[in-house]
């Protein structure tokens, strides 16, 4: 995988595909039994929620706002979730699930290649957040108002991502490829540079920076920072 286009061809992260996974995860509580109907309405609900949250904040968004913008009745909404907190956890849970699914499966050929694995992690994380941009902005911007369960899930996901980066760094140090005195701290410093892409994407776009260019520049910067020894 060398480009955003390659990544998107490999992973179906369309709104419909993501909502199909939400339906699968919450099938026991969603009361709509026809999958096609349920997925279509979930897509309307989630897309409207992400749009409203970006405009006025999730905390300030009411279910009435959601009914007006989605075109679904209050009763229809309650067929999918019983409260705003449940809706929030459905969205956040999908973000966390995709992160684990996509980043947790590096190519087998990188098992003994920590430098390649680090590049893959950085590039894949960036392409993932670009593809699911509204979802990640929602998770980042709304974190302060999450209920405890949501905050715990968000922190666990962030620590998981940092752990993957730290593991690649530690492997590289062991093999004499990286010069990093503290891999956990290094991973914690790298993570905000990944987040900067989706939190401040408009700034980068104004500068003409594409996702592929940002990925290449970020990788070059990180490799220099960790003292990659070219073999």
Set out the residue ranges of the language-model regions.
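Helix-turn-helix
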Residues: 52-86
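N-terminal intrinsically disordered/low-complexity leader segments
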Residues: 1-38, 231
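Short, amphipathic alpha-helix enriched in basic
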Residues: 31-32, 38-65
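An amphipathic alpha-helix adjacent to DNA-recognition modules
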Residues: 43-47, 59, 80-104, 162
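Hydrophobic alpha-helical connector segments
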Residues: 105-134, 187-190, 215
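Amphipathic alpha-helical packing segments from all-alpha helical-bundle domains
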Residues: 94-104, 128, 149-175, 184-188, ...
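Amphipathic alpha-helical segments used for helix-helix packing
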Residues: 19, 130-149, 203
């Amino acid at each position: 995988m060398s480009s955003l286009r390659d990544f998107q061809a490999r992973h179906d992260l369309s709104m419909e595909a993501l909502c199909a996974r939400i339906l699968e995860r919450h099938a026991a509580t969603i009361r709509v039994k026809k999958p096609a109907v349920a997925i279509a309405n979930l897509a309307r609900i989630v897309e409207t929620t992400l749009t409203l949250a970006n405009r006025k904040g999730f905390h300030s968004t009411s279910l009435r706002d959601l009914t007006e913008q989605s075109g679904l009745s209050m009763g229809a909404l309650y067929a999918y979730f019983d409260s705003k907190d449940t809706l929030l956890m459905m969205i956040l849970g999908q973000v966390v699930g995709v992160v684990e699914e996509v980043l947790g499966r590096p190519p087998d050929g990188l098992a003994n290649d920590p430098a390649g694995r680090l590049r893959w992690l950085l590039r894949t994380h960036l392409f993932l957040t670009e593809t699911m941009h509204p979802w990640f902005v929602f998770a980042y911007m709304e974190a302060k108002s999450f209920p405890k369960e949501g905050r715990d899930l968000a922190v666990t996901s962030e620590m998981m991502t940092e752990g993957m980066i730290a593991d690649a760094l530690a492997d590289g140090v062991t093999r004499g490829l990286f010069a990093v005195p503290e891999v956990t701290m290094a991973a914690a410093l790298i993570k905000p540079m990944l987040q900067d892409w989706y939190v401040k994407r408009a700034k980068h776009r104004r500068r003409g920076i594409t996702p592929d260019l940002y990925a290449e520049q970020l990788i070059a910067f990180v490799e220099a920072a960790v003292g990659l020894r070219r073999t």
